[in-house]
């Protein structure tokens, strides 16, 4: 099959605000899709840019005593750093305040003018006498003229969805100075869409999903209204050719920025190439600009329209809109100062299903899903298998037996199903399938009990570990669009330099395994709590770009926990010396019936025999078998404790909080049953 040629864009982030975790829903999922396409061997170019024009930029720069150019340069630097640290990889990230965009905007405008689509109308407009400027839609608030909802912007109502002119608002006020504006007449340019009524009505169903097209087509029951494309000076943007003191409305040149970024990347010819697919990823709040005005502008100027517009919903946190007061309006930088980017990328993948439904981020579920699935289920295979192979078997993979080969083949066979989910942007289903493979691999591992067989049959153990690690390798390949850095580390483990989608069909046998490298960490709820508190405290969470960069020095490493439990009473060293800490190999681990906390753990303690310990750590191990084969540290000389469920013969050391983060203290592959731990 011939490789596809694809151009992909995400909506342009505005240069007057921080990137926050709501924005990242779009950029992260676009990055998933682009990386997948590249792994499939397709030529896929991902372009984006900062949206830099408009009154907010001008006013913000004026307040700070700097030029708009200085403001947008600073903002772009921060945006690029945030995207980079979240492992979002653009082929070109540009700016709309560019010579390419100016040239293309004028070209597209003149084409519409020549076709007679541009008209002039004198219209009433709100003017603030204190600020000495006509007020853009977003700089005036008042009562919705349709439903009576208060505190609505001058272009549309959040309550009823109606659109209107700012002069129609009841009790309007300037959002900059809170003064009541006056009405003044001003001549403006309008882009008439009605001449393209038939074209757009046919275009929309073929290039959007049914839920989006059904909404848009409601507007076609009547003649399409003209679209005001000009703004009065003072304004930061491109002046309209032949129109003194009139500037292109930001939504005219913003989408043209896609083409300008492509041109800046040296790939301008791809846009109109009939063999190239064009895809936009956008939020549902900007549908009308991308699915009505934008294809109309492109069509009038002889440019190809997008192949498909992919629309997603908004992000809610703990079931509510993001809130500054609750600390859930979190900037990308505040997140990175407290938590690793891989965790959010994985969680978003597990939740995104390619629909316009809003996506929920539940912070407790976030911790649990990352710890249980990514760390405890998937990474656990590499951790247990890789470290045992390196420490006990010289790091050499062997050959697989029939059972192991069947497991690996199952993983290979799942490849096209997972690929289809990626293609359809059903990333949640891709994650489900990968987790099913992880379940099968863990079941195989636990059934073969390599922690036991290593004592009596090293080659049998090598066969088991070879199959388990090959299964993990395939899963890591399937995860690469979601977790690129994680996958690169896994790739080095197997001594490889490049993975594409077809790499999953190969197996690694009778070869050396590289050094095991840390892949993923468990999330501590305290890290999440620290992030929430930081979000409450930082003024940058208002959505404005702060004066100073808040770049993390540790690039997303977990932050130090601000608070901890108070120290208990002081003890002497002699007290500590009384403890006899030993290593025990977990022979079996099972849930204690009718208990929500207890696990029954049987330890092989070497010459000391076996110990049964009841431990309240069930919350950290949703699947008790995860502990089997682990070498854990326990207090061996603790007096036996009679409990209602039996006699507990020791205490297992635990670090963290059961059910949230942490686990039994392990030293796998270092010691053996009965060894003293010092």
Tell where the protein language model's regions lie, with residue ranges:
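Beta-strand segments within the central parallel beta-sheet cores of soluble alpha/beta enzyme folds
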Residues: 308-311, 491-493, 600
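Intrinsic disorder at enzyme termini
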Residues: 487-575
């Amino acid at each position: 099959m011939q490789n596809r040629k694809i151009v992909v864009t995400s909506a342009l982030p505005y240069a007057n605000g921080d990137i926050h975790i709501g924005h990242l829903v779009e950029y992260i999922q676009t990055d998933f899709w682009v990386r997948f396409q590249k792994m499939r061997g397709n030529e896929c170019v991902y372009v984006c840019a900062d949206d830099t024009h408009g009154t907010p930029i001008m006013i913000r720069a004026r307040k700070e005593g700097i030029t708009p150019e200085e403001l947008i340069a600073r903002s772009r630097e921060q945006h690029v750093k945030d995207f980079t640290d979240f492992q979002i990889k653009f082929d070109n990230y540009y700016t709309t305040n560019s010579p390419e965009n100016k040239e293309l905007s004028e070209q597209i405008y003149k084409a519409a003018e020549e076709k007679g689509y541009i008209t002039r109308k004198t219209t009433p407009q709100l003017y603030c006498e204190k600020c000495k400027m006509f007020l853009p839609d977003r700089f005036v608030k008042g009562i919705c003229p349709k439903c009576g909802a208060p505190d609505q912007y001058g272009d549309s109502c959040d309550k009823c969805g109606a659109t209107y002119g700012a002069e129609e608002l009841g009790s309007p006020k300037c959002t900059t100075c809170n003064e009541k504006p006056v009405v003044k007449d001003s001549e403006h340019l309008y882009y008439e869409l009605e001449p393209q009524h038939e074209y757009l009505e046919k275009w929309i169903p073929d290039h959007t999903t049914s839920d989006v097209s059904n909404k848009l087509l409601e507007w076609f029951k009547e003649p399409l209204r003209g679209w005001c494309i000009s703004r009065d000076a003072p304004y930061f943007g491109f002046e309209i050719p032949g129109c003194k003191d009139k500037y292109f409305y930001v939504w005219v040149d913003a989408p043209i920025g896609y083409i300008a970024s492509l041109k800046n990347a040296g790939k301008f010819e791809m846009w109109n190439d009939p063999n190239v697919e064009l895809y936009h990823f956008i939020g549902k709040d900007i549908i009308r600009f991308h699915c009505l005005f934008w294809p109309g502008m492109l069509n009038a100027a002889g440019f190809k329209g997008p192949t498909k517009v992919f629309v997603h919903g908004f992000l809610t946190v703990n079931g509510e809109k993001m809130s500054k007061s609750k600390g859930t309006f979190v900037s990308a930088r505040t997140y990175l100062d407290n938590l690793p980017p891989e965790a959010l990328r994985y969680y978003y993948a597990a939740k995104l299903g390619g629909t316009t439904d809003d996506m929920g981020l539940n912070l407790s579920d976030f911790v649990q899903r990352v710890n249980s699935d990514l760390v405890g289920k998937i990474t656990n295979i590499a951790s247990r298998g890789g470290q045992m192979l390196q420490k006990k078997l010289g790091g050499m993979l062997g050959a697989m037996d029939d059972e192991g080969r069947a497991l690996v083949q199952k993983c290979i066979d799942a490849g096209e199903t997972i690929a289809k989910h990626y293609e359809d942007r059903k990333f949640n289903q891709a994650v489900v399938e990968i987790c099913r493979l992880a379940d099968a691999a863990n079941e195989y591992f636990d059934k073969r009990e390599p922690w036991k067989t290593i004592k009596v049959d090293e080659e049998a153990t090598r066969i088991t570990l070879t199959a388990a690690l090959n299964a993990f390798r395939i899963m890591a390949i399937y995860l690469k669009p979601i977790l690129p850095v994680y996958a690169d580390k896994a790739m080095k483990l197997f001594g490889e330099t490049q993975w594409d989608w077809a790499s999953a069909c190969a197996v690694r046998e009778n070869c050396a395994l590289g050094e095991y490298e840390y892949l993923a960490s468990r999330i501590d709820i305290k890290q999440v709590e620290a992030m929430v508190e930081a979000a409450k405290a930082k003024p940058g969470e208002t959505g404005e770009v702060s004066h100073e960069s808040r770049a993390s020095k540790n690039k997303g490493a977990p932050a130090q926990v601000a608070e901890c439990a108070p120290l208990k009473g002081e003890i002497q060293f002699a007290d500590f010396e009384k403890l006899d800490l030993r290593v025990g190999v977990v022979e079996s681990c099972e849930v204690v019936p009718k208990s929500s906390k207890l696990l029954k753990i049987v330890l092989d303690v070497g010459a000391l025999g076996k110990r049964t310990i009841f431990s309240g750590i069930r919350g950290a191990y949703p699947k008790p078998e995860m502990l089997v084969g682990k070498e854990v540290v326990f207090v061996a000389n603790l007096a036996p404790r009679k409990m209602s469920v039996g006699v507990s013969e020791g205490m297992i050391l635990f670090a963290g909080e059961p059910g949230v983060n942490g686990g039994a203290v392990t030293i796998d592959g270092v010691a053996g049953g009965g060894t003293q731990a010092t």
